[in-house]
Design a protein with these regions (language model features):
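Intrinsically disordered, low-complexity segments enriched in small/flexible residues
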Residues: 1-107, 115-118, 276-281
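Short hinge/gating elements
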Residues: 35-38, 130-131, 166
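Short, basic, glycine/proline-bearing loop/turn elements
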Residues: 98, 127-136
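Glycine-rich anion/phosphate-binding loops
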Residues: 105-110, 135-150
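A structural preference for short, pocket-lining loop segments at secondary-structure junctions
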Residues: 116-128, 144-168
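A generic structural signal for short coil/turn motifs at secondary-structure boundaries
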Residues: 133-137, 169-172
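Conserved catalytic cores of soluble enzyme domains
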Residues: 165-281
Length: 281
């Protein structure tokens, strides 16, 4: 079968739910349906509430919006914006997909890196974006993160990272998979310098990102209801031939089993991060 004729299977991480496209109502106000309480929420209200429904459901958030929520006003300085993926394997359709995603998102890659002040604390930050190829990790993402941790180690700064990912970017093959070890090695050097690394796991944090730097943090937080895991629940059920428990891979389930340190609602994250950063100063 020709590669170009390959039919991509439906990806549950990419359709519906937390980042589905808002529906335009007759009066012209876009609305988003909450998968939890099933209410139709005006998009303007949802944006004003930092993409959190009144029932507590956390929708996915764009990287730029998250930085505005967490950063002290005017403090964020972006780094490595010129680092972007190309098509090292000549994968059919990859160039066109990158061009389309960049045009739609106004971003160059699936992660934004830089320096910032959070509650007055100077640190480095990276924020992954589900709206850029589901935050998939390719060679450019790995390069940006590696550079960020090396810079943080040089400047003796803590790193705060917000993860969201469907895993390694298949269009880059082994080059994407090797970023797991590459970034984790940079995290280790940063840790060996006695510096703090805090991760905030958002929905979904899966695949190679979970198996590497997402779970390397000294302190690991997670947003309510976020999916955190390696393989998908359906794959696990089909492989083990066993039914999975309720809430499997949800942040609360992961917390109960000791893989994260705390659940942090979006409106409380800046205060908590400030307290943790100040404890380390």
């Amino acid at each position: 079968m020709a590669l170009m004729n390959f039919l991509k299977p439906k990806n549950k991480l990419e359709e519906g739910g937390r980042c589905s496209v808002p529906v335009m109502q007759d009066e012209g106000e876009p609305e988003q349906k909450c998968p939890n309480c099933h209410r139709e929420i005006p998009l303007s209200r949802l944006m004003a509430d930092n993409m959190v429904c009144g029932c507590g459901y956390h929708f996915r958030m764009r990287a730029g919006q998250r930085i505005k929520l967490i950063a002290d006003e005017g403090s964020f300085v972006e780094m490595y914006k010129d680092v972007r993926a190309d098509n090292p394997l000549g994968f059919p359709g990859y160039d066109e997909k990158l061009d389309a995603v960049r045009a739609a998102s106004s971003q160059t890659e699936a992660v934004i890196c830089g320096t910032v002040r959070i509650g007055g604390c100077h640190c480095c930050i990276f924020v992954m974006d589900a709206y850029f190829m589901m935050g998939s990790m390719g060679s450019a993402v790995g390069e940006k993160l590696t550079r960020l941790f090396e810079y943080a180690a040089w400047k003796h700064l803590a790193v705060v990272g917000f993860t969201v990912s469907g895993g390694a970017r298949m269009q880059e093959g082994l080059l994407s998979l090797m970023q797991m070890a590459r970034v984790s090695a940079a995290v280790k050097r940063h840790s060996d310098a006695g510096l703090l690394y805090i991760t905030v796991l958002t929905d979904p944090t899966t695949g190679g990102v979970t198996a590497s730097f997402a779970m390397d943090g000294d302190i690991i937080l997670a947003e309510p209801g976020a999916i955190v895991g390696f393989a998908g629940a359906r794959v696990i059920e089909q492989t083990t031939k066993k039914a999975l428990p309720d809430g499997f891979q949800k942040a609360e389930f992961v917390l109960e089993h000791g893989f994260v340190d705390a659940i942090a609602a979006r409106n409380k994250q800046k205060k908590l991060l400030t307290e943790l950063l100040k404890m380390h100063e």
